[in-house]
Amino acid sequence: TRRQREDGVRTGVRLGYGSYDTWMTEATNQVKKGRFNSIITGSYNRTNGHRPDMEFEQYGGYTRLGYELDHSWNVSADLNLTHFNASNPGTVSTPVFDNDSRITRGMTSFALENRYERTSGALKFFYNWGKHHINDGYGTGEEPLDYRFNSKDRMMGISWYQSASLFSGNRLTAGID
């Protein structure tokens, strides 16, 4: 995502429509006022697919807030969420029934970054999570499954690195995760 360099507000909307009732939409708002900057994006995408039981639908959102502490240091936090529903009919010769997925994923992070003429780096905290509900479906002549794949996951961590250009054409980076 590009940061806005000059003070002001920019808002944009993208809409697309295609065959099989396919929609691709996105709305974005960017703000820069003094040392503060933000971006907020929301999207909705869907299609019926080119075959029965091949639908896909996705909702997404992203937010980033940032603040320049001084010319060389800034802090930021962001959040990215998406949820999608998908159906898979199998192949034409080997159809699958009720093969449906409902998946939600998210990510958030916080960063303290520095940028000088010959060195730059960051301290970052990140957290990712997801919730998955998947029906593997069943084939012709089979019984529907009496269970679902359900999963929840979480991952978090801290990353620190500093990079320096000691001479022209050189960059040395050290860090830990």
Please place each PLM-identified region on the residue numbering.
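Subset of outer-membrane beta-barrel
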Residues: 33, 43, 58-62, 66-68
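Short strand-turn segments of transmembrane beta-barrel domains in outer membranes
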Residues: 2-31, 41-42, 47-54
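Residues on the lipid-exposed face of transmembrane beta-strands in outer-membrane beta-barrel proteins
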Residues: 27-31, 63-67, 110-114, 158-164
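Transmembrane beta-barrel architecture of outer-membrane proteins
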Residues: 22-24, 58-60, 103-107, 153-161, ...
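Outer-envelope beta-barrel architecture signal
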Residues: 7-11, 23-25, 34-38, 59, ...
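Flexible loop and strand-edge segments within Gram-negative outer membrane beta-barrel domains
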Residues: 47-54, 58, 68, 72-122, ...
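C-terminal extensions
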Residues: 16, 70, 137, 143-177
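Transmembrane beta-barrel strands of outer-membrane/channel proteins
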Residues: 13-17, 40-44, 77-83, 123-129, ...
